[in-house]
């Protein structure tokens, strides 16, 4: 039997940090922004941070993995 090799690409979910902070402070939001993307685990072993548009905040914010 052949070995099952994990690929270099993994699917990740990016969430808005501003929406998460507002939910933690007690402010109720209707929803928060979540993007789905892929990353290469060998090129970027650390957590990914991208600046994306958040529709619930209506501005560009940092989204973290």
Swiss-Prot record:
GO terms for biological process: translation. It is found in: Plastid, Chloroplast. PROSITE patterns: RIBOSOMAL_L33 (PS00582). GO terms for cellular component: chloroplast; ribonucleoprotein complex; ribosome. Keywords: Chloroplast, Plastid, Ribonucleoprotein, Ribosomal protein. It comes from the Eukaryota. Its main location: plastid. It holds the Pfam family Ribosomal_L33. GO terms for molecular function: structural constituent of ribosome. Belongs to the bacterial ribosomal protein bL33 family. PANTHER family: 50S RIBOSOMAL PROTEIN L33, CHLOROPLASTIC, LARGE RIBOSOMAL SUBUNIT PROTEIN BL33C. This is Large ribosomal subunit protein bL33c. The gene is rpl33.
